[in-house]
Amino acid sequence: MRTTLKVNGRSVDVDVADGMPLLWVLRDELKLTGTKYGCGVASCGACTVHVDGVPLRSCVTYPEDIEGAEVTTIEGLATREGRAVQQAWAELDVVQCGYCQSGQIMSAAGLLAENGRPDPDEIDGYMEGNVCRCATYQRVRAAVARAAEILEDDS
């Protein structure tokens, strides 16, 4: 099946097998490997991308359902919120193994786009769908709060 997607600001025409999730289109067809496979059932968050600015799990999102929508992967995250999150991640040395980080960062940027001043409970609630086997949850929470501070300082 031929589908046209807009990925990281550019239009791409891809030929995908019926039932192929967006995750595999991104990784295998477009060679955008920052988006990770974790569970395949939308439970871990490693595959999070933005579709029209909304964080979605690419392992259960199908290209034919989002044709014409803007897909943003970690490679293309250039929003104000995305830059603040990446700066905070580096400042607070959040990463351990790093496998979940692209999904964590995409979710955090989505939260801050919706709510620029989240409280700790809002951060936890929004990020709870992102699993980290290294248990960096406290550092993730601190980095999201720091990114909110960066955004506030820059406004």
Describe these PLM feature segments:
Residues 1-155:
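Signature of N-terminal electron-transfer/Fe-S-associated modules in redox systems
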